[in-house]
């Protein structure tokens, strides 16, 4: 009977860690218990095996349970010694390979759908908190001042005061009524006739003064209806010029915004700039030809690769991509992944929301799967300009690396330094950081070394190359090894070779997808024009748009933190749920604001340009620019927060006369691209009503700001008290710690911050100084010389002649005075 038992068993040599087509048949035929034990162990280590066994019929599950119970009872006595050795070897191989299932069958094809997508995250947006809340709570940030609490507290106080006033009014009315009744009784007793006013109810409906309320209400409704929007394209607007006066006004508004009218100054400047740009372009073209490596021309069409399987990626990477529902690579991913796997330097550019993060994370993970594992080493550094972007990239990367053994660490300001140092001691494979915190650990953390870095990624590289980050980036680039792979990505990548040379690129490959600074084709761009003299009513226009037109999932961008905070208070007083996001907030507050907006707790996110780059929040329907940004590049990043990953979106810009250049550039680029551009007309009367509401709340806004400032001072005082107590208790330990160093002085840091603010918002108005008359004259003279109107100029003789005349005249006058004095004495 022994030979028959051998025939029914599955040969050990043929067993591989893949999905077997006859797996269930083996279980039904009563396979060898040692082999089934190996099957059970691999099923527990693989999620796909779990899903397949879960979908098997109930009878088979019962049989498997019986087999497990029999194995527990009998142990290894039933299985042969050879089978035990084979099982131990298989377990060791599975442990060494991590979560990889071993060798693949040559004809095996990874199934992206079906069982593999059972754990798919629908609508993955990169902001699912894994350990962000815990780390935020542990970082020791002081308790933030909540504007909503202040507003609700003041509202309760006002309601209480109003109730007290109403009670007093009721008492006073009762007293007056009692007095009136007493007087009426006295009058009746005197025999006077009473006047009955109830006959007024029998007046005709068309009598004088009747229906006045209805006319007012109809007028208000008509005004409300008139505050609609004209969302027709430019081609439709040109055909509506003939009509009533209202139509003419609307058409003029549309043409003035959607169709840019050439300004004389702009035309002169454009002519001068065109000649200069032609010379610069020729020089830059020669530099680029020598600097960039030639892009490899492929015979395949861009849409030929329909799946990530065509890149020959490892199975754990494919499983991670399927878990976040990434099935078809985007154009930038199709171009980047093959080149990045070869280890070449890359300068990549694509429109917002095109998957640039996955374009560099996927090849990094693929290369790290083949790294030496004996000694833990940090090999990759990914630098981001903002904390929110670093947290988002960390979440995306960890999701994609779920089925691998690659470790990550995020070095972001606002979190605990001690916890980050403890993680750095374990030498994580990938470090995702902001430049400031990266330099802090690089100089002050003894367990952190950058000598082993092999890959450097700069996301939003054009922002990182600006003056605000120049010093920090130079400090990092001069410290890390020069023999590295460097990848730069941005939606508005700079073409300046001089800036790219600073990064230390080695014959980079330039991968440009939609390199003409285009927007998404699913984005509709709207413009609301403010006539000259109505710039002060800008907030009224914003409140009308947010309360009547765009009521949910809206990001509003501001240039200044102060303005964003003030509008946040106005929204709270008017009952609009909003959160703010800017640099004056703590990291805990910033993450809380993004989470509240992502989860739908608030409908509006009031942000500065801190949130304009890279922030990917699912379901953002509208982006409103409270005022146009400083440049067209910043405008592209702002409006790129919506209409991402194939979804539709809308961008609305409130533009005044100073914003004419940016609007003109946006309209020109949109027309060249064929994007949807429309004009929205808001009735001035409606905007004035909302502006009047804001003016009525000015005192309340100031009171809220004062109370908030008082609470901040109280929190700072409490923090100072706690700091003093800690110094008294642990003074020796605190003073023994080495002082943290930085590569810049305080003056240099202030100068770099000032340069960064100038890049975003232009030169500050405070820097403008009134010219003296001497400076004005000097400028006028230089202008005249430049125009060729140099007139006659005095020579040496002409300049000396007035001086001689003055001296002679002075002597004559003194002689006359002396003669007059002598005459007076005589």
From Swiss-Prot:
Residues 128-138 have a biased composition (Polar residues). Residues 538-690 form the Helicase C-terminal domain. Residues 337-511 form the Helicase ATP-binding domain. It holds the Pfam family DEAD. It is found in: Nucleus, Nucleolus. A motif (DEAD box) lies at residues 459-462. Residues 139-176, 285-308, 764-788 have a biased composition (Basic and acidic residues). Its main location: nucleus. GO terms for molecular function: ATP binding; ATP hydrolysis activity; RNA binding; RNA helicase activity. Disulfide bonds: none annotated. GO terms for biological process: ribosomal large subunit assembly; rRNA processing. ATP binds at residues 350-357. Keywords: ATP-binding, Helicase, Hydrolase, Nucleotide-binding, Nucleus, Ribosome biogenesis, RNA-binding. ATP-binding RNA helicase involved in ribosome assembly. PANTHER family: ATP-DEPENDENT RNA HELICASE DBPA (PTHR47959:SF1), ATP-DEPENDENT RNA HELICASE RHLE-RELATED (PTHR47959). Belongs to the DEAD box helicase family. DDX27/DRS1 subfamily. The Q motif is unique to and characteristic of the DEAD box family of RNA helicases and controls ATP binding and hydrolysis. This is ATP-dependent RNA helicase drs1. It comes from Aspergillus clavatus (strain ATCC 1007 / CBS 513.65 / DSM 816 / NCTC 3887 / NRRL 1 / QM 1276 / 107).
């Amino acid at each position: 009977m022994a030979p028959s038992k051998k025939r029914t068993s599955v040969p050990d040599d043929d067993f591989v860690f893949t999905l077997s087509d006859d797996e269930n048949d083996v279980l039904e035929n009563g396979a060898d218990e040692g082999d089934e034990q190996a099957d059970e162990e691999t099923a527990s280590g693989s999620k796909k095996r779990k899903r397949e066994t879960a979908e098997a019929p109930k009878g088979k599950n019962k049989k498997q349970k019986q087999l497990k119970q029999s194995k527990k009872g009998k142990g290894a006595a039933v299985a042969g010694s050879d089978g035990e050795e084979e099982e131990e070897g298989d377990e060791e191989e599975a442990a060494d390979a991590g979560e990889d299932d071993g060798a693949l069958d040559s004809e095996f094809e990874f199934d992206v759908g079906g069982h593999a997508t059972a754990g798919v995250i629908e609508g993955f947006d990169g902001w699912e908190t894994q350990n962000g809340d815990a780390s935020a709570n542990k970082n020791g940030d002081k308790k933030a001042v909540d504007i909503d609490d202040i507003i609700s507290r003041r509202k309760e106080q006002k309601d209480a005061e109003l109730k007290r006033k109403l009670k007093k009014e009721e008492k006073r009315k009762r007293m007056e009524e009692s007095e009136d009744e007493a007087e009426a009784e006295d009058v009746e007793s005197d025999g006077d006739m009473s006047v009955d006013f109830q006959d007024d109810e029998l007046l005709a409906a068309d009598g004088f003064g009747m229906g006045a309320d209805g006319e007012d209400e109809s007028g208000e409704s008509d005004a409300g209806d008139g505050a609609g929007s004209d969302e027709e394209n430019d081609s439709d607007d040109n055909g509506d010029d003939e009509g009533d006066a209202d139509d003419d006004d609307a058409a003029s508004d549309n043409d003035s915004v959607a169709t840019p009218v050439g300004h004389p100054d702009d035309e002169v400047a454009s002519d001068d700039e065109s000649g200069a740009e032609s010379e610069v372009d020729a020089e830059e073209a020669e530099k680029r030809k020598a600097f960039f490596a030639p892009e490899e021309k492929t015979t395949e069409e861009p849409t030929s690769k329909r799946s990530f399987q065509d890149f020959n990626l490892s199975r754990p990477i494919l499983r991670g991509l399927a878990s976040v529902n990434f099935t078809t690579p985007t154009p930038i991913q199709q171009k980047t992944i093959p080149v990045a796997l070869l280890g070449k330097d890359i300068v990549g550019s694509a429109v917002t929301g095109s998957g640039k993060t996955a374009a560099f994370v996927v090849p990094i993970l693929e290369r790290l799967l083949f790294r030496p594992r004996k000694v833990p080493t940090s090999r990759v550094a990914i630098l981001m300009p903002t904390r929110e972007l670093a947290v988002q990239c960390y979440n995306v990367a960890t999701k994609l690396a779920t089925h691998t053994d690659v470790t990550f660490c995020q070095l972001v300001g606002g979190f605990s330094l001690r916890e980050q140092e403890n993680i750095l001691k374990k030498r994580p494979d990938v470090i995702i950081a902001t430049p400031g915190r990266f330099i802090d650990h690089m100089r002050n953390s003894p367990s952190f070394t950058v000598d082993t870095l092999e890959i450097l990624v700069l996301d939003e590289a054009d922002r990182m190359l600006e003056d605000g980050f120049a010093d920090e980036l130079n400090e990092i680039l001069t410290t890390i090894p020069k023999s590295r792979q460097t990848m730069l990505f941005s939606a508005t990548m700079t073409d300046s070779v001089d800036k790219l040379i600073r990064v230390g690129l080695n014959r980079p490959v330039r991968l440009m997808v939609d390199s003409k600074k285009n927007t998404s084709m699913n984005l509709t761009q709207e413009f609301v024009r403010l006539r000259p003299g109505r710039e002060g009513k800008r907030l009224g226009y914003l409140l009308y748009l947010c309360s009547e037109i765009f009521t949910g999932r809206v990001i509003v961008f501001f240039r200044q933190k102060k303005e964003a905070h003030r509008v946040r208070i106005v929204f709270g007083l008017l009952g609009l749920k909003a959160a703010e996001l800017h640099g004056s907030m703590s990291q805990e507050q910033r993450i809380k604001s993004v989470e509240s907006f992502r989860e739908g707790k608030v409908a509006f996110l009031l942000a500065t340009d801190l949130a304009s780059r890279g922030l990917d929040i699912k379901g953002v329907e509208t982006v409103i620019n409270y005022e146009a940004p400083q440049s067209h590049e910043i405008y592209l990043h702002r409006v790129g927060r919506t209409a991402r990953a194939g979804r539709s979106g809308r961008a609305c810009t409130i533009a005044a006369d100073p914003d004419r250049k940016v609007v003109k550039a946006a309209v020109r680029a949109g027309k060249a691209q064929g994007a949807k551009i429309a004009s929205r007309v808001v009735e001035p009367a409606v905007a004035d009503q909302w502006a009047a509401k804001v003016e009525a709340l000015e005192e309340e806004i100031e009171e809220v700001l004062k109370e908030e400032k008082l609470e901040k001072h109280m929190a700072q005082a409490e923090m100072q008290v706690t700091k003093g107590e800690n110094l008294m208790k642990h003074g020796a330990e605190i003073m023994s710690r080495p002082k943290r160093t930085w590569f810049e002085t305080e003056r240099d840091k202030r100068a770099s911050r000032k340069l960064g603010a100038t890049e975003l918002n232009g030169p500050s108005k405070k820097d403008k100084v009134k010219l003296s008359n001497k400076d004005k004259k000097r400028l006028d003279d230089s202008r005249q010389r430049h125009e060729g109107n140099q007139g006659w100029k005095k020579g040496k003789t002409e300049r000396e002649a007035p001086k001689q005349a003055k001296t002679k005249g002075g002597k004559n006058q003194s002689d006359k005075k002396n003669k007059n004095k002598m005459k007076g004495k005589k």
